Regions:
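Polytopic transmembrane helical bundles with strong interfacial aromatic enrichment
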Residues: 1-154
């Protein structure tokens, strides 16, 4: 059961990774990018359309990750500690902290993207989106590294 939840968690994380990366690239792209350039393609789809999906995917990924976390703490972490993977454990501790910080900024992120653009929210949108993108990328990469060190079913 845990392996199935981990796989679904990973699939949702990939969808979240794609959505937040696209939105971050779109908002950080130059506003006058040529239509057929690399950044122009990011700007072609309005970044506002991603906000609700990102909030939903973040919460779904967090809930599934919380379920898998119990298995990790009981069955996987003791092996990592025994084998002295202290760097990996430290990165995972940072991941835990970053994910909770992401949960804390999620309402502000959603509120900034819900309001119409009035020029005042532009900088706040960019900062919150880039911060959330960093958290999602960090969590994704650390989760994969830990799974590679001592994966499920080992």
């Amino acid at each position: 059961m845990t392996t199935i939840v981990l796989i679904v968690h990973g699939l949702i994380a990939v969808a979240l990774l794609g959505a937040i990366t696209h939105q971050a690239m779109a908002i950080c792209a130059p506003p006058h990018a040529k239509p057929h350039s690399f950044f122009g393609h990011f700007r072609a789809i309005p970044a506002e359309r991603f906000a609700n999906a990102i909030v939903f995917l973040y919460l779904a990924s967090w809930l599934l990750g919380a379920f898998v976390y119990l298995y990790f703490k009981i069955d996987i972490q003791p092996y990592l500690e025994r084998d002295r993977h202290w760097h990996a454990m430290g990165f995972f501790d940072l991941k835990e902290d970053f994910v909770v910080i992401g949960l804390g900024i999620l309402p502000a992120y959603w509120l900034c993207w819900r309001r119409p653009v009035d020029g005042q929210n532009d900088r706040m949108r960019m900062v919150l989106t880039v911060l959330l993108a960093f958290i999602v990328w960090w969590s994704f990469l650390v989760g994969h590294v830990l799974n590679d060190i001592r994966g499920f079913g080992s």
